[in-house]
């Protein structure tokens, strides 16, 4: 099954937060599932960290390594994505 992780789910997962239910952790770690994380969420994390609204236990620069280690694919944003959004 495919899963797109939202920002809070990812933050809870990377921080090992107890707010993330065990069944969700199991789905993320299940190698039969494919997990995705948007670069837009990484951008959101960077902004919120600068505003001291969120905290990561890991260094921000380790997000890509964490995703690679946990088989989470980072999805890019293209100009075409923005065009679709603009035309909604």
Report the location of each language-model feature.
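Positions that flank functional sites
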Residues: 43, 64, 82
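Active-site neighborhoods of divalent-metal-dependent phosphate/nucleic-acid chemistry enzymes
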Residues: 55-61, 69-88
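Short, well-structured N-terminal submotif of metal-dependent ribonuclease cores
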Residues: 1-37, 53-65
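Generic structural signal for small/hydrophobic residues in well-ordered secondary structure
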Residues: 7-8, 45, 85
